[in-house]
Swiss-Prot record:
SUPFAM superfamilies: ClpP/crotonase (SSF52096). The gene is clpP. It comes from Shewanella sp. (strain ANA-3). GO terms for cellular component: cytoplasm; endopeptidase Clp complex. It comes from the Bacteria. This is ATP-dependent Clp protease proteolytic subunit. Coiled coil: none annotated. Signal peptide: none annotated.
Length: 202
C-alpha cells in the first residue's frame, strides 16, 4: 500500500542536464530552485514551512542581491507555519516576488500580499481568498477562553499587517475578513493584495 507522499514523489518529473562531467538528473523543483524559483503548493504546515524557509535562506546565501520568486498555489493552513515563512521573507536581503497560480487562500493570500511591493502578481485565472483565522478548540472552559483570546490577538495582528501591505484602512480589512472573501485576479489588484495581473512573461 503506497501512501500519498510516495505517490506524489513518484509523479515529480526528473530533468536531465548536461554538465562538464556528464549527465546529471534533478527533480523539477530542485532544477527550478537553481533559477531562484520556490514553489509553495498545498496546505501550509510546519514541515512545508521549514522547507520553504530553508530554501529562502539558501538562495540568500547564494546571491543576496538577486530576487527570489515564490509561486503560490495554496488553500492556506497553519498561522504559525505561515508566519515562519512570512518573517523569513521580510528578514532576508533579496526581494521576494510572489506569484499566485491557481489559488492563494487564507494564509496563502497573506503570504502573497507579503511579497515585495511592485513584485506581487496573479496569473489571470487565479483566485485569492482572505478571511479571519480559524480556531477549533476542545477542553476545559478556562483553556477555551485562553485560546479564544489568543486567536483574537492573532486576528488583530494579521489585519494590521494586511492593512500595511494592501494600503486598505484597518476597518476595511476587519470588515472584509469577517467572512470568506473571494477575489478574482483583477479584484486582488484593485484591493492591493497584488500589484498586477501577469498574462505573459515580461
Amino acid at each position: 500500500m503506497h501512501n500519498a507522499s510516495d505517490i506524489q514523489s513518484a509523479l515529480v518529473p526528473m530533468v536531465i542536464e548536461q554538465t562538464a562531467k556528464g549527465e546529471r538528473s534533478f527533480d523539477i523543483y530542485s532544477r527550478l530552485l537553481k533559477e531562484r524559483i520556490i514553489f509553495l503548493v498545498g496546505q501550509v504546515e510546519e514541515h512545508m514551512a521549514n522547507l520553504i524557509v530553508a530554501q529562502l535562506l539558501f538562495l540568500e546565501s547564494e546571491s543576496p542581491d538577486k530576487d527570489i520568486f515564490l509561486y503560490i498555489n495554496s488553500p492556506g493552513g497553519s498561522v504559525t507555519a505561515g508566519m515562519a515563512i512570512y518573517d523569513t521573507m521580510q528578514f532576508i536581503k533579496p526581494n521576494v516576488s510572489t506569484v499566485c497560480i491557481g489559488q492563494a487562500a487564507s494564509m496563502g493570500a497573506f503570504l502573497l500580499a507579503g511579497g515585495e511591493k511592485g513584485k506581487r502578481f496573479c496569473l489571470p485565472n487565479s483566485r485569492v481568498m482572505i478571511h479571519q483565522p480559524l480556531g477549533g478548540f476542545q477542553g476545559q472552559a478556562s483553556d477555551i477562553a485562553i485560546h479564544a483570546q489568543e486567536i483574537l490577538g492573532i486576528k488583530h495582528k494579521l489585519n494590521l499587517m494586511l492593512s500595511e501591505h494592501t494600503g486598505q484602512p484597518l476597518e476595511v480589512i476587519e470588515r472584509d475578513t469577517d467572512r470568506d472573501n473571494f477575489m478574482s485576479a483583477t479584484q486582488a489588484v484593485e484591493y492591493g493584495l497584488v500589484d498586477a495581473v501577469m498574462t505573459k512573461r515580461g
